[in-house]
Amino acid sequence: MKKIFLTTVLAILTIFSFASKPHIDNVVVSTENSTIKWIGSKISENHEGTVNIKKGILMIDHGKLVGGQFSIDMQSISTTDMSDKLNKKLDGHLKNEDFFNVEEFPLAIFTINTIQKASGGVNSFEILADLTIKGITHPVTFISTVKIEGLNFSAIAKIKIDRTKWNIKYGSGSFFENLGDKMILDKIEFDVTLLSVN
C-alpha cells in the first residue's frame, strides 16, 4: 500500500513538473505587414511619417506574450504629410545629428521586459520595455492590445516618449529660449502595429 502511495505521489509530481515548465516559442515579426507611424509636433503644426522594422521576435509561452525584441531601421525614417520636396528636406534633417544621427546610430532597439494584465479588456496589457535610441537606453511603459491564436499574433500600441531623454534636444523649449513658433515639443508619439509572419 505504501509503495502504491509513493508511486502515485511521484506520478503526480512528475505531471506537475512537466506542466510548470515554460515552453517558449520565438515568433518572427512580419517586417512587411508591421508598421510604425510617428507624429512630431511644433507649436503650430504636426508632422507625421513612418519608420520600418528591420527584424523582430516575440516570445510566446502557452499563448501568452512573455517577452521579445525588435530593431528599428532609423535610416528608413520618412515624412508623409507634405509634398515630396518638403518631405525629403525634413527627412534629411531627421537623419542628421540634430535628431537621430542615423549614420552613427542606424538602429533603435526595443526590448520587452515585463507584461501584466491591464484594465480595459481581455486583450489589454501593460508592457514595460527598454528603448535604445542613439545608444541611450531608457524604460518606457505603455498599454497594448495583444491578440494571440496559436503562433499568430497581433499587437497594437500607442507609445509616447520624451525625446530629450535620448539626447534629441533640437528646438526643445526645455533647453532653448526664445524659439517662438519654431519650438518643437519634446513628446514624440509612435503608433505601433506588430503582426506575425504566420
Feature-to-residue mapping (PLM):
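Low-complexity, acidic/polar, glycine-enriched regions of mature
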Residues: 18-198
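Bacterial Sec-dependent N-terminal signal peptides
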Residues: 1-25
